[in-house]
Amino acid sequence: MNTANNTLPTAADWAGEDAAPDAADTRKIERESHKLEKRLCREVGRAITDFNMIEEGDKIMVCMSGGKDSYTLLDILRKLQKRAPVKFDIVAVNLDQKQPGFPEHVLPDYFKSIGVQYHIENQDTYSVVKRVVPEGKTTCSLCSRLRRAILYKVADDLGCTKLALGHHRDDIVATLMLNMFYGGRMKGMPPKLVSDDGKHVVIRPLCYVPEKDTARWAQYQQFPIIPCNLCGSQDGLQRVAVNEMLREWDKKFPGRIESMLRAMGHVVTTHLMDPHLHDFKNAKATGIADPNGDMAFDHEEFPVAPALPGLQVVQLG
């Protein structure tokens, strides 16, 4: 054992027979971490390719909140940057909205430690929101509008060509559900969009990544997470309910959320009810067979969902 100069024992000092279980656990964690890193890089790379998110010479502004998702986004983009087929720059940006208790040092310290270019924008939107929104009402909507306008201006000032947000697969599916349940429309979060002013391109490179993977990666990397409830306001009860529903679905029916995400990319407009997407009024029989047409009276066939591990289906009678 290394006890010179009264130093504490190192990991090597404990690498005897008694330490074997801990060493095995460490190797297992390292293997799982490596597999997760490869999966994250693969899924983010697939999203970038599928939707042409990043192009030669882009300057990507990664919007950092201090949560697990934005940390994961920044980390994976930096890993991909080293081996990407195109050259692009990254700048990490945090909007400090002057919420009471916000740890101002955490993000700058982290950015410096990893050597990434960064910018902290200080804007007291917290006071504005508290002054305008009545007590007891949710502040999220106004806060997000103010934040969006400020971030667009920062992107212009920094010469950024794209803004990258940390919304993941579960966020996208939850937004679709919220709009269907409470808004009466089929609308989610697009993986790539042009802002309403026509000047900015927003990308969501984590669109294929499940939340459980960003949570696990944040745990492995020990990111200095900043809590999201400093302002005292939370997402509405509707989003809370939908997120809980999706979590339960993921436990009981593995693959359902992934299937819903795939459905968002395979929309059959002729089989919905939006007259702006299909001319139902003028639909008439032509007498010409259409191999892709509808067999109106046929029963739709779906693949059998995989059974949960450890469960056996027993037929009675």
Swiss-Prot record:
UniProt name for this protein? tRNA-cytidine(32) 2-sulfurtransferase
Q: Name the gene that codes for it.
A: ttcA
Involved pathway(s): tRNA modification
**Family listed:** Belongs to the TtcA family.
**Listed GO cellular component terms?**
cytoplasm
Which PANTHER family does the protein's record reference?
AMINOTRAN_5 DOMAIN-CONTAINING PROTEIN (PTHR43686:SF1), SULFURTRANSFERASE-RELATED (PTHR43686)
CDD domains per the record?
A: TtcA-like
Q: Where in the cell is it found?
A: Cytoplasm
Q: Where does [4Fe-4S] cluster bind?
A: C140, C143, C231
Annotated function: Catalyzes the ATP-dependent 2-thiolation of cytidine in position 32 of tRNA, to form 2-thiocytidine (s(2)C32). The sulfur atoms are provided by the cysteine/cysteine desulfurase (IscS) system.
Family annotation (InterPro entries): Rossmann-like_a/b/a_fold, TilS/TtcA_N, tRNA_Cyd_32_2_STrfase
